[in-house]
């Protein structure tokens, strides 16, 4: 089953959106297999955003993600990477559709509430960066047969 990494950023945590965000993914039928509230170290932030290291906005990304608590999550399900991106919405909230998390809860690209992996390769990299294998709990909800055609 496909997995993706999501992180509720400090603005989402501070604004009390954690439960709402988790609920959206549960209601879609995805399974939460990893969850932790954490303070992100500069080292982890720099590794996570490493692809942007030479860009002018890199220091701002690192400073923001380390500015407060983050909820790191791993979700599992068919098509979870692409569908999570749809649920999250465009990176710039001004371009995000209403009904998406960013369309409903964010107004500034620098405070866009949530991060989600954008590809299977990045999902694997980010999951391995943020979680140890033993922190992930594979399980099958009783509702699986009501979500997926077997």
Curated annotation (Swiss-Prot):
Q: What are the recorded GO MF terms, alphabetically?
A: ATP binding; metal ion binding; nucleoside diphosphate kinase activity
Q: Where does ATP bind?
A: 9, 57, 85, 91, 102, 112
SMART domains for this protein: NDK
Report which reactions are catalysed by this protein: a 2'-deoxyribonucleoside 5'-diphosphate + ATP = a 2'-deoxyribonucleoside 5'-triphosphate + ADP; a ribonucleoside 5'-diphosphate + ATP = a ribonucleoside 5'-triphosphate + ADP
Any one GO cellular component localisation term in the record:
cytoplasm
Query: What SUPFAM superfamilies does UniProt report for this protein, alphabetically?
Result: Nucleoside diphosphate kinase, NDK
Transmembrane regions listed in the UniProt entry? none
Sorted keywords for this record are: ATP-binding, Cytoplasm, Kinase, Magnesium, Metal-binding, Nucleotide metabolism, Nucleotide-binding, Phosphoprotein, Transferase
Record's protein name: Nucleoside diphosphate kinase
Name of the encoding gene: ndk
């Amino acid at each position: 089953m496909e997995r993706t990494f999501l992180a509720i950023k400090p603005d989402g945590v501070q604004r009390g959106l954690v439960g709402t965000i988790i609920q959206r993914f549960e209601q879609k039928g995805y399974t939460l297999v990893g969850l932790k509230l954490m303070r992100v170290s500069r080292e982890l932030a720099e590794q996570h955003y490493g692809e942007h290291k030479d860009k002018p906005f890199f220091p701002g990304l690192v400073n923001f993600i380390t500015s407060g608590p983050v909820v790191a999550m791993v979700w599992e399900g068919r098509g979870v990477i692409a569908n999570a991106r749809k649920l999250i919405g465009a990176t710039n909230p001004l371009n995000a559709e209403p009904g998406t998390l960013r369309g409903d809860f964010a107004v500034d690209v620098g405070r866009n509430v949530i991060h989600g992996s954008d590809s299977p390769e990045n999902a694997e990299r980010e999951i391995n960066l943020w979680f140890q294998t033993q922190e992930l709990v594979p399980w099958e909800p009783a509702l699986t047969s009501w979500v997926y055609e077997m």
